[in-house]
Every structure is written in C-alpha cells, then in structure tokens.
Amino acid sequence: MKRAWQRMLSGRRLDLLDPTPMDIEIEDIAHGLAFVARWNGQTTGDYAYSVAEHSLLVEELFARANPGIGERWRLAALLHDAPEYVLGDMITPVKAAIGKGYVELDDRLTAAVHLRFGLPAVLPAPIKRAIKAADTVSARLEAEQIAGFSEAEADRIFGKPDPVLVRGLAIRLRPPPEVRAAFTARHHVLLRSLSG
C-alpha cells in the first residue's frame, strides 16, 4: 500500500486512513485551515477567504442562533471543518460527486479531532443540525459579499438569513498568519473554559 500519512509541521505523522487523537494538534489544524481557501479561492480581496476565518464566523453565528449554548458545543462549531486542514475544502458539488469515500475520510478525521479535544466522536444530531444551519448562513454571507453571487442567487441557493442573526457581521479577509493566530486563540479560550 502507498503512504497514507502526512507529516505535520508539529512533527506528528497523521495517518489519513486511520487517524488517532494523539496525532492531532491544534497548531496544525489552525495552520492548515488558515491556508486553505474557501470557494476554491474564487473570492474578491487581497487574501483568500480561509476555512479558519469561515470557522470563526460559523462559531459566532452558532452562538448567536443558540443563546446560552455551552462552550463545548461552541468548540464543536469552531472545529466543524477541521478535517479540511489535511483534506482541503472541496465545494459541495465536488464532495457529492466523490461520494462515500470522501465522507468516510471526513468522518474518521472528525472523530479523531473531536476526541482529541474532549468532544464526543459523533455529535448529537440537534447540535450537528444547529452547526450546519450556522454553516449555511455563513456560506450565504460569503456568497454575496465575496464570491460574486447576486443577493437573489444567494437567497435561492442558501436561503435568506435572519437579519437579526447577521446584524453587524461582515466577512473578514486577513493574512493567513493573522487568522491562524485568531483561530488558535479562540480555540484556547473555548478549551480553557471547559477545563474550568
């Protein structure tokens, strides 16, 4: 069999087919996500809109949509796309075309990431749905603000967002090192709140 692992900047060797929580480091995740572009890089601005930046927005939207939700589930929202630090961010039509193989890889990596940071390997269905709802609102904002969709087209594909939910939010484009630091800092805040 060919090599199925990747050497991470932390020095860890992550087996992509059989990942273990011991091989997951937040610095590797933050670095990878800060350099992975959403929308295949087809966005306006001087910097690609990164998966790390998107994840920060999803966590904020999730918290706004679910007042009083615990930090544990906010951490899950922040990490909702964590496997993309090694798999990359494929747009939805490509994921659908690839099918089951991609889903299985994503599920294995997700479980390892969750276990590494004290979350259940598989999230409860209501939490998963609530995170997906925040993810969809984020995609809607991104589509219109930076990905070239008209308002009507974005509404048709992603739905019209609740104006109260998105009030004051704007898509941020930052250099990868800056968003990497922001993602890592947010992760540390959420993780610290879980440990008391």
Curated annotation (Swiss-Prot):
A Pfam family this chain is assigned to: HD
Organism lineage string: Bacteria, Pseudomonadati, Pseudomonadota, Alphaproteobacteria, Rhodobacterales
Gene3D superfamilies per record: Hypothetical protein af1432
InterPro entries: HD/PDEase_dom (IPR003607), HD_domain (IPR006674)
Name assigned to this protein: Uncharacterized protein RCAP_rcc00048
Organism: Rhodobacter capsulatus (strain ATCC BAA-309 / NBRC 16581 / SB1003)
Domain HD span(s) in chain numbering: 51-164
